Swiss-Prot record:
GO terms for molecular function: 2 iron, 2 sulfur cluster binding; 3-phenylpropionate dioxygenase activity; iron ion binding. GO terms for biological process: 3-phenylpropionate catabolic process. It catalyses: 3-phenylpropanoate + NADH + O2 + H(+) = 3-(cis-5,6-dihydroxycyclohexa-1,3-dien-1-yl)propanoate + NAD(+); (E)-cinnamate + NADH + O2 + H(+) = (2E)-3-(cis-5,6-dihydroxycyclohexa-1,3-dien-1-yl)prop-2-enoate + NAD(+). HAMAP family: HcaE. Pfam families: Rieske, Ring_hydroxyl_A. Gene3D superfamilies: Naphthalene 1,2-dioxygenase Alpha Subunit, Chain A, domain 1, Rieske [2Fe-2S] iron-sulphur domain. GO terms for cellular component: 3-phenylpropionate dioxygenase complex. This is 3-phenylpropionate/cinnamic acid dioxygenase subunit alpha.
Length: 453
């Protein structure tokens, strides 16, 4: 069995000097360790509460490569279970979502209540004349399930920090999406799913730390849609063009701490997002006063930004896209994209949000394709021996980190930096190399102290 010491994890990641060896994106042994020590120990997004509002409502998803079913209980609480029959490991729930009174295995007919208990075994007296202790054979339950302002997370590790502690300062940035209006948020429409032939860490890192790519990777989209407010017809919608926000922003920052990352621009416009249509930008202008009262000016104006909660939950402010990067091997990721909107928005505005998110960041989105092409091409190149063992530069903004005194929390840097990427890979390496969460937290504290010297 391959151990963390065999893999020399800390020789592959050097965050103090800004180095990463790309073998971390290709090695199958590293990937198997990730499934155990990252996806088996971290808080992972499962669903939004709006997707399972009534008792018996369920939603099927994954924790790493483990299929799980999330279900609303009769008392209103939420449980999650491994989507696997305890008899011969068959899946017990197939529909993406729905409402049910029981989950029945199609192989031999074992049936489970929505609370996970085994409630029926066909031909039980004849098949098990010696008796069967059904209370012992219920579905395997995810032991830790918690919600944060509508987002449901699960964790297999009972020794992990609670969800709120795990989120840390990224919660302040997350609230900028979840808490703009009274009533919170909801998921609009279904889930868009597609597969990208790249390692899961590429998209996670980009959403945590990489605004830098947008100037070049998305240059053609900006040019086609209209690079400035010049009165031309190259518009996304009434009153909104694709003028790059970095051309007019007052300032910008990147946050990177505990493996999480975020970046955004300081703007003076309540509709400052380059990829939304007229109905959406009008909605942001009309609701700005409420958002400012709830969040303050900085977060109310924060509509152009990128974010990732370690390991695989990403979102873009303003564009209304929330997505999960489900790992499917060292060289493949399955994207699940949701449209998340204010619950208080009108149906017309929600439809506009959905159209806008799909147009830019759906599977055929004009920006999504730029990103996917980059990640896939990198993954192809890393098939080469020298390519996957040649160190890459992760030095952007190295040594320039600071803590702000204006109420914006956490370790920050200028937006064009790799502070969040270095923090993400440090948390990644610490998890793979540690036997316990306490050891991880001790290493995190030491790393952050070193960063802020």
């Amino acid at each position: 069995m391959t151990t963390p010491s065999d893999l020399n994890i800390y020789q592959l990641i050097d965050t103090q000097n800004g180095r990463v060896t790309p073998r971390i994106y290709t090695d199958p042994d590293i990937y198997q360790l990730e499934l155990e020590r990252i996806f088996g120990r971290c808080w992972l997004f499962l669903a939004h509460e709006s997707q399972i509002p009534k008792p018996g409502d369920f939603f099927n998803t994954y924790m790493g490569e483990d299929a799980v079913v999330v279900v609303r209980q009769k008392d209103g609480s939420i449980k999650a279970f491994l989507n696997q029959c305890r008899h011969r490991a068959m899946r017990v729930s197939y529909a993406d979502c729905g409402n049910t009174r029981a989950f029945t295995c199609p192989y031999h007919g074992w049936s489970y209540g929505i609370n996970g208990e085994l409630i029926d075994v066909p031909l039980e007296p004849r098949a098990y004349p010696q008796g069967l202790c059904k209370s012992h054979w219920g579905l395997n339950e995810v032991p830790c399930v918690e919600s944060y302002k509508g987002l449901i997370f699960g964790n297999w590790d009972t020794s992990a920090p609670g969800l709120r502690d795990y989120l840390g300062d990224i919660a302040w940035y997350l609230d900028g999406m979840l808490d703009r209006r009274e009533g919170g948020t909801e998921i609009v429409g279904g889930v868009q799913k597609w597969v990208i032939n790249c390692n899961w860490k590429f998209p996670a890192e980009q959403f945590a730390s990489d605004q830098y790519h947008a100037l070049f990777s998305h240059a053609s989209a900006v040019q086609v849609l209209g690079a400035k407010d010049d009165g031309s017809d190259k518009r996304l919608g009434d009153g909104q063009t694709a003028r790059p926000v970095w051309e007019t922003a007052k300032d910008a920052l990147q946050f990177g701490q505990d493996g999480h990352g975020s970046g955004f621009f300081f703007t003076e416009k309540p509709d400052a997002n380059v990829w939304v249509d007229g109905a959406v930008s009008s909605y942001y202008r009309e609701t700005y006063a409420e958002a400012e009262q709830r969040l303050g000016e900085v977060r109310a104006l924060r509509l152009a930004g990128h974010n990732n909660i370690f390991p695989t939950l990403s979102w873009l402010n303003g564009t209304a896209t929330l997505r999960v990067w489900h790992p499917r091997g060292p060289d493949q990721v399955e994207v699940w994209a949701f449209c998340i909107t204010d619950k208080a928005a009108s149906d017309e505005v929600k439809a506009a949000f959905e159209n806008s998110a799909t147009r830019a960041f759906g599977p055929a989105g004009f920006l999504e394709q730029d990103d996917s092409e980059n990640w896939c091409e990198i993954q192809k190149l890393l098939k080469g021996h020298r390519a996957r063992n040649s160190k890459l530069c992760l030095e952007m903004g190295l040594g320039q980190e600071k803590r702000r005194d204006d109420g914006i929390p956490g370790i920050t840097n200028y937006i064009f930096s790799e502070t969040a990427a270095r923090g993400m890979y440090q948390r990644w390496a610490d998890l793979l190399s540690s036997e316990s969460w306490q050891e991880v937290l001790d290493k995190t504290a030491a790393y952050q102290q070193e960063v802020m010297k």
